[in-house]
C-alpha cells in the first residue's frame, strides 16, 4: 500500500491542474506513462503520431510549438460565477427535474490544416453554439473550470435534493477520453489522501464529504426533534449486457427485480454501510480497480463498461413535543457511461471488438429511450421501453421516473471530434425534454394510520371468514379485484430470493395508535360527566324540594329553610324587613347582616360534584340539608331533642363552636380543600389560570335576641310601656321573631366557599361597610342602654315568679290559694298593680311554665354567639370581643388560603418538574434502546461476516493442504523417476493422473448439472402449482361473488313472487266478495212468476193488429223471459 501511494503521488506530481492546458512534453510523458483510466484527461489521452517534419521542427532550437496559446472565445465568462448564478436561480425545493450541463475538455493537440480547435462557444447563459447550431443547456463549464466549480454547479444541488427526500442522479455522457471518469471520481491519489483538500478530487468524494458534514450539522442543530441517518452504498457495472458486482467480483450476471415495495433493484447486490468519507473512498477504489478497461484511439485506459455507484440515505426523525415520527429515504446515483471510440482516425482498419459493439448497442438503446421519453405522452407507443437493455432497465427511476437527474455532457473542443461533440449535444438537448416526476420519499403518521385502517379491515375480514359468514362485505379488502392484484404480486415475487429485512427504528408501541381505545376513553369521560351532571341536579332538587321539617317546634322555620341559597345581600334584608316591619330597631339590627361569608357560584362551574358547603359558627343549633351529602335521609338530617343525638349532629353539621371539636381554622381548611381541588380542575380544563376566592366579612354585628321567658317578663314588669312594644312582644309576634331569627341563622348557615369568576371591588365595599357599621353601632349603644334598665327590673320579677312557681308545685294546698299568696306578695312589692294586671300576670306565668317545660328537653349546648343573641347584648365589651374574634378568624382564614395557594403552586411546579424528568428519562431510555438495537444488529452482521470469512479461510486452508499434498506426491514421483532417462515416463504418469482428475471433475460436473436440472424442474412444477392454486382461489372468489349475486337476485325475485301471490290472493278474495254481493243483489231484486205472466199477457193484448211480425216479437220476448226466469228463481 505504501508503494502504491508513492507511485500515485509521483504520477500526480507529473500531472497538471484539473483540465488545464498541458505542454507537448507533458502530453508525451502522460501518454507514455499513464496507466490509470481516471487520471487527468490531458495525461490519459494519447496524442496522434507526429510526422518527421514535425519532429524536426519541434527539435529545432528556438522553435516554440505552443508559443501562441489558443485563446478561448470571449463569450464565455468565468465558470465559477456562472455556476453561482445557475445555483442561485434553481433552489433545492424548486429545482427542475432534468438539467443538462456541458463541460469542455481542453485540447492536447495542435491545429491541423489551419482549423480552429475551439469551435464550441457559449452564446448565452442557457445556450451553447457549435458553428451555426445552437443548443439549450442549464450550465456550462469551459476548459478553465476546476473540479471545485463542477462540484458547486452539480454536487451542491444534489446534496440539497437528497437531504430533502428526493432521488437525485448524475449521468456522465460523452465520447471516450473526454474526462467523464475524471470529473466523476477524480484521481486515485486524491482518494488515497482524503485528509487533504486535493484539487483533483472528483464530484463523488466532494459530495460525500459535504453530505456527511451537513448530516452532522443537522443532528447537532435540531433540539426539537431527534434525527438519525444511515447510508449504504453499492457499486455495479454493466459489461456486455451483464450486471456484475464490483464490490464482490464473484457475483456476476445478476438479475434485475422489480416490485411495488422495493422498486427496481438488483438481486444479491452487495451493500456496504458507510459513515465517513474514508469508507466511501475505500469502496470507490475497490470498485474502480475491478472495472473493465481497454485501449482505444482516444485513451490508453478507457472504460469499457458502464458503472453505477448508488447511495441510499435513510433518515428517521421523531419530534420531542408531539411524539410524531417520520422516515425519509432518498437515493443518490452516479452513472459513468462508457464512451464510444472515434473511428475517423483508423477508418476501416479499426477492429470493432465485442466490447465496443456492446457499448455502442447499449448507448443506442439509451438514445432511443431518451427520444421516446422526450416525446409527448400521447405519442409514446411502447409501454415498457426501459426493458430493451440492462442499462436502461436499471436506470428506470433515473430516466423518466422518480428522480432529479443531471446530465453532464463531456465534449472535446478539438475539430477532429466535431461529429461526436454534435451527437453528444443533441443527446443533451433531447434529454432536457424528458419529464421526470420527482416526489419526496417520506412515510408519515398519516401513512401509518392508513396502514392501520387497512390492517383493521383485514382483521375484520379474517374474523368474518373464520366465523363462517359467507356474505362478502361491499367495501371489503378481499374482493375479486384485490384478489387479482394479490395473485399478480405473488407471480412477480415467485423465484425471488430473500431480501435483508429493513431495520425498524421505532417500536410498534410508539407507532401504533389504537383508535378504539381512544374512543372508549372518550365514552367513559362522557359518561362520567353525564353522571356528575345528574348527581348535581339530584342534589339541587333534593335541597330545594324536600319539605321535611327540621324542628318540631318551628314549622315555619323548616319551610323557609327549604328555600335556595341567596347570594345577593339585598334579598334577605327585604324579607326581614317584611317580617319585622313593626319594629324599627329590629330592622336596623337585621340590616347588620348585610355582609356575611358567601361567594357566588360561578356560571362556568364544571360538571362535577359541588364542594361541601362550609358551616359557620353563626349557625343555629340544628342541622342543615344544604351542608350534607345528597344521600342522607331526612331522618338523619333532623335534629333530635334528646342529648343523645349530639354525635349525629356533629357529623352532619360540623358547625357550632361548642358542638364541634375542630377549631374555626381547621373547619375552614377542611372546607377549602375541596374548593382548591375545584380550582385545580378548572385550571386543567383550560379555564382561567387564576381563580379568586371571595371571603366577605364586612360586618359581624350581632342581632340581640331575647328569650321567650325574658320577653314575657318584660311585658309583666312594664305595663305602662305596653303600647310601645306590644306589637313586637305579643304571643303571635313572638313566634314571628323566633321564625325570623331562625331564618337569619339559616341564612348565615348557608355561607359557602365557591369559585368566584371576577374580583369584587373591595374599596367600595369597605367604605360602605364602615359607614353602616358606625351608624349601627350608635343605634346599638342607645338600644343597649335602654334595654339595660328593663333587664334589671325584669330580672328581679322573674326570680320572684320562679320561686313562686316552685313553691306552688311543691305545696299540697290548692292552686288558687298559692296564686292569692303570690298576688299578695306582688301587691306588697308593687302596690300600683290592679286586678286586671294580676290576671294577666297569672296567665303569663302559666304560659311561661308551659314554655319552660317545652324548653327543658331541648339541648343546652348553645354557642356563645347564640347566648349573645338571646340576651347578652347589654354587655358591649362581649360584642366587641366577638367582633375582634371574627376579624382575627377572617385574617387567619385569608392567610391560610394564601398559604394553601402557595403550597398548591409549589406542588404543581414540583409535579411538572418531576413529569419533565420522567419524560426525559423515557426519551433517554428509548434512545439507549435504539442504540442497543442498532449495535446488536451491527454486531450480528459482523459475526455473520466473520463466519463467512472463517468458512472461506477453512476452504482455502483445505485447498492449500491438497495442493501441498499434490506437490509432495509429485516430488516423490520425481524422486522415484531419477535424473536421467525417466522424464518421459514421469510426464506420462503425470498426464495420466491429470486425465483421471479431469474425468472425475467432469463426472462431478455432470452430476451437478443433472441435479440442477431436476431442481429447476421441481421449481417450475412448484411455481406452476402455486400459480394454479392462486388462479383457483381467484376463480373460487369470483364464483362465490357470482353465486352471492345470484342468491341476492333469486331472493329479490322470490320476494317479488310473494308480493304477486299476495296481490293475486287479494284479487281473488275481492272477486269472490263482489260475486257474493252481486248474488245478494240479484236475490233481493227477484220478481214472482205471476208478475212476469201478467206482463206477458198485457203485452199480447196490447198488440192485436200485428200478425206475423207480432208473433215473432212475442216469441222473442218469451225466449228472453225463459232465459232470465232461472236467474230470478
UniProtKB/Swiss-Prot annotation:
Annotated ranges, domain Kinesin motor: 97-434
Basic residues compositional bias, start-end: 1-12
TM segment ranges: none
CC per GO annotation: cytoplasm; kinesin complex; microtubule
Binding, ATP: 174-181
InterPro entries from the UniProt entry: KIF15/KIN-12, Kinesin_motor_dom, Kinesin_motor_dom_sf, P-loop_NTPase
Protein name: Kinesin-like protein KIN-12C
Amino acid at each position: 500500500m505504501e508503494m502504491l501511494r508513492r507511485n500515485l503521488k509521483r504520477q500526480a506530481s507529473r500531472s497538471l491542474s484539473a483540465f488545464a492546458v498541458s505542454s507537448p512534453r507533458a502530453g508525451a510523458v502522460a501518454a507514455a506513462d499513464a496507466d490509470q483510466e481516471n487520471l487527468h484527461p490531458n495525461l490519459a489521452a494519447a496524442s496522434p503520431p507526429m510526422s518527421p517534419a514535425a519532429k524536426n521542427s519541434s527539435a529545432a532550437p528556438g522553435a516554440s510549438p505552443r508559443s501562441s496559446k489558443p485563446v478561448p472565445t470571449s463569450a464565455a465568462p468565468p465558470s465559477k460565477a456562472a455556476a453561482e448564478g445557475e445555483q442561485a436561480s434553481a433552489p433545492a425545493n424548486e429545482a427542475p427535474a432534468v438539467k443538462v450541463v456541458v463541460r469542455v475538455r481542453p485540447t492536447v493537440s495542435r491545429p491541423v490544416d489551419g482549423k480552429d480547435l475551439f469551435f464550441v462557444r457559449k452564446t448565452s447563459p442557457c445556450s451553447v453554439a457549435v458553428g451555426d447550431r445552437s443548443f439549450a443547456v442549464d450550465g456550462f463549464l469551459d476548459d478553465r473550470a476546476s473540479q471545485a466549480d463542477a462540484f458547486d454547479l452539480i454536487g451542491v444541488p444534489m446534496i440539497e435534493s437528497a437531504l430533502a427526500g428526493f432521488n437525485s442522479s448524475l449521468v456522465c455522457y460523452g465520447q471516450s477520453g473526454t474526462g467523464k471518469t475524471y470529473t466523476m471520481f477524480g484521481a486515485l491519489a486524491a482518494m488515497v489522501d482524503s485528509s487533504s483538500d486535493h484539487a483533483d478530487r472528483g464530484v463523488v468524494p466532494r459530495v460525500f464529504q459535504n453530505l456527511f458534514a451537513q448530516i452532522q450539522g443537522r443532528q447537532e442543530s435540531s433540539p426539537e426533534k431527534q434525527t438519525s441517518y444511515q447510508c449504504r452504498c453499492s457499486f455495479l457495472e454493466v459489461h456486455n449486457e451483464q450486471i456484475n458486482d464490483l464490490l464482490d467480483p464473484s457475483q456476476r450476471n445478476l438479475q434485475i427485480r422489480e416490485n411495488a415495495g422495493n422498486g427496481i433493484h438488483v438481486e444479491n447486490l452487495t451493500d456496504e454501510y458507510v459513515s465517513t468519507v474514508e469508507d466511501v473512498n475505500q469502496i470507490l477504489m475497490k470498485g474502480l480497480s475491478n472495472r473493465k478497461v481497454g485501449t482505444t484511439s482516444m485513451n490508453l485506459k478507457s472504460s469499457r463498461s458502464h458503472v453505477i455507484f448508488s447511495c441510499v440515505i435513510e433518515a428517521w426523525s421523531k419530534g420531542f413535543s408531539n411524539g410524531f415520527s417520520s422516515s425519509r429515504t432518498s437515493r443518490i446515483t452516479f452513472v459513468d457511461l462508457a464512451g464510444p471510440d472515434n473511428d475517423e482516425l483508423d477508418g476501416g482498419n479499426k477492429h470493432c471488438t465485442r466490447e465496443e459493439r456492446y457499448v455502442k448497442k447499449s448507448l443506442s438503446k439509451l438514445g432511443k429511450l431518451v427520444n421516446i421519453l422526450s416525446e409527448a405522452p400521447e405519442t409514446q407507443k411502447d409501454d415498457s421501453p426501459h426493458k430493451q437493455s440492462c442499462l436502461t432497465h436499471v436506470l428506470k427511476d433515473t430516466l423518466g421516473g422518480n428522480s432529479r437527474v443531471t446530465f453532464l455532457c463531456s465534449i472535446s473542443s478539438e475539430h477532429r471530434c466535431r461529429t461526436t461533440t454534435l451527437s453528444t449535444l443533441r443527446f443533451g438537448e433531447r434529454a432536457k425534454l424528458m419529464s421526470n416526476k420527482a416526489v419526496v420519499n417520506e412515510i408519515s403518521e398519516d401513512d401509518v394510520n392508513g396502514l392501520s385502517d387497512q390492517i383493521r379491515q383485514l382483521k375484520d375480514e379474517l374474523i368474518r371468514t373464520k366465523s363462517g359468514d359467507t356474505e362478502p362485505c361491499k367495501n371489503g379488502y378481499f374482493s375479486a379485484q384485490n384478489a387479482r392484484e394479490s395473485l399478480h404480486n405473488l407471480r412477480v415475487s415467485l423465484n425471488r430470493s430473500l431480501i435483508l429485512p429493513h431495520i425498524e427504528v421505532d417500536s410498534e408501541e410508539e407507532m401504533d395508535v389504537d383508535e378504539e381505545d381512544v374512543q372508549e376513553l372518550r365514552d367513559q369521560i362522557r359518561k362520567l360527566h353525564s353522571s356528575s351532571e345528574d348527581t348535581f341536579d339530584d342534589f339541587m332538587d333534593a335541597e330545594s324540594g324536600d319539605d321535611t321539617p327540621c324542628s318540631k317546634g318551628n314549622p315555619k322555620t323548616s319551610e323557609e329553610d327549604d328555600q335556595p341559597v341567596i347570594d345577593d345581600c339585598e334579598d334577605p334584608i327585604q324579607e326581614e324587613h317584611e317580617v319585622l316591619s313593626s319594629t324599627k330597631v329590629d330592622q336596623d339590627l337585621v340590616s347588620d347582616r348585610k355582609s356575611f361569608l358567601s361567594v357566588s357560584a360561578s356560571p362556568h362551574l364544571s360538571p362535577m360534584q359541588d364542594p361541601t358547603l362550609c358551616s359557620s359558627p353563626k349557625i343555629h343549633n340544628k342541622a342543615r340539608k344544604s351542608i350534607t351529602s345528597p344521600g342522607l335521609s331526612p331522618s338523619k338530617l333532623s335534629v333530635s331533642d334528646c342529648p343523645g343525638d349530639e354525635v349525629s349532629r356533629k357529623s352532619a353539621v360540623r358547625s357550632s363552636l361548642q358542638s364541634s371539636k375542630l377549631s374555626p381554622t381547621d373547619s375552614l381548611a377542611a372546607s377549602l380543600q375541596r374548593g382548591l381541588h375545584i380550582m385545580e380542575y378548572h385550571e386543567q380544563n383550560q379555564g382561567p389560570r387564576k381563580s379568586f376566592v371571595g371571603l366577605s366579612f364586612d360586618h359581624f354585628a350581632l342581632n340581640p335576641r331575647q328569650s321567650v321567658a325574658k320577653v314575657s317578663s318584660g311585658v309583666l314588669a312594664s305595663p305602662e310601656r305596653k303600647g310601645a312594644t306590644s306589637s313586637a312582644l305579643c304571643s303571635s309576634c313572638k313566634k314571628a321573631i323566633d321564625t325570623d331569627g331562625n331564618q337569619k341563622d339559616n341564612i348565615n348557615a348557608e355561607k359557602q366557599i365557591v369559585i368566584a369568576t371576577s374580583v369584587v371591588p373591595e374599596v367600595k365595599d369597605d367604605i360602605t361597610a364602615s359607614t353602616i357599621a358606625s351608624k349601627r353601632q350608635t343605634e346599638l349603644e342607645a338600644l343597649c342602654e335602654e334595654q339595660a334598665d328593663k333587664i334589671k327590673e325584669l330580672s328581679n320579677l322573674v326570680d320572684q315568679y320562679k320561686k313562686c312557681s316552685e313553691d306552688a308545685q311543691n305545696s299540697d294546698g290548692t292552686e288558687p290559694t298559692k296564686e292569692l299568696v303570690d298576688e299578695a306578695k306582688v301587691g306588697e312589692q308593687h302596690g300600683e298593680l290592679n286586678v286586671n294586671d294580676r290576671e294577666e300576670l297569672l296567665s303569663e306565668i302559666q304560659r311561661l311554665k308551659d314554655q319552660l317545660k317545652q324548653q327543658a328537653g331541648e339541648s343546652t349546648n348553645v354557642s356563645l354567639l347564640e347566648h349573645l343573641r338571646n340576651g347578652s347584648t347589654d354587655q358591649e365589651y362581649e360584642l366587641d370581643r366577638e367582633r375582634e374574634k371574627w376579624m382575627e378568624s377572617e385574617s387567619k382564614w385569608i392567610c391560610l388560603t394564601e398559604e394553601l395557594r402557595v403550597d398548591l403552586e409549589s406542588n404543581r411546579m414540583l409535579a411538572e418538574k418531576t413529569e419533565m424528568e420522567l419524560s426525559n428519562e423515557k426519551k433517554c431510555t428509548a434512545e439507549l434502546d435504539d442504540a442497543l438495537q442498532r449495535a446488536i444488529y451491527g454486531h450480528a452482521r459482523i459475526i455473520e461476516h466473520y463466519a463467512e470469512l472463517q468458512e472461506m479461510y477453512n476452504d482455502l486452508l483445505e485447498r492449500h493442504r491438497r495442493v501441498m499434498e499434490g506437490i509432495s506426491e509429485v516430488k516423490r514421483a520425481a524422486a522415484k523417476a531419477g535424473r536421467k532417462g525417466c522424464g518421459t515416463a514421469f510426464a506420462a504418469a503425470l498426464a495420466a493422473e491429470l486425465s483421471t482428475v479431469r474425468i472425475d471433475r467432469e463426472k462431478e460436473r455432470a452430476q451437478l448439472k443433472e441435479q440442477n436440472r431436476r431442481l429447476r424442474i421441481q421449481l417450475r412444477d412448484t411455481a406452476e402449482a402455486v400459480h394454479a392454486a392462486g388462479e383457483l382461489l381467484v376463480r373460487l372468489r369470483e364464483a362465490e361473488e357470482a353465486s352471492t349475486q345470484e342468491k341476492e337476485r333469486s331472493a329479490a325475485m322470490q320476494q317479488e313472487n310473494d308480493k304477486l301471490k299476495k296481490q293475486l290472493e287479494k284479487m281473488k278474495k275481492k272477486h269472490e266478495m263482489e260475486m257474493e254481493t252481486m248474488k245478494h243483489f240479484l236475490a233481493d231484486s227477484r220478481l214472482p212468476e205471476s208478475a212476469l205472466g201478467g206482463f206477458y199477457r198485457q203485452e199480447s193484448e196490447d198488440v192485436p193488429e200485428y200478425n206475423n211480425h207480432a208473433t215473432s216479437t212475442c216469441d222473442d220476448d218469451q225466449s228472453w223471459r225463459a232465459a232470465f226466469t232461472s236467474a230470478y228463481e
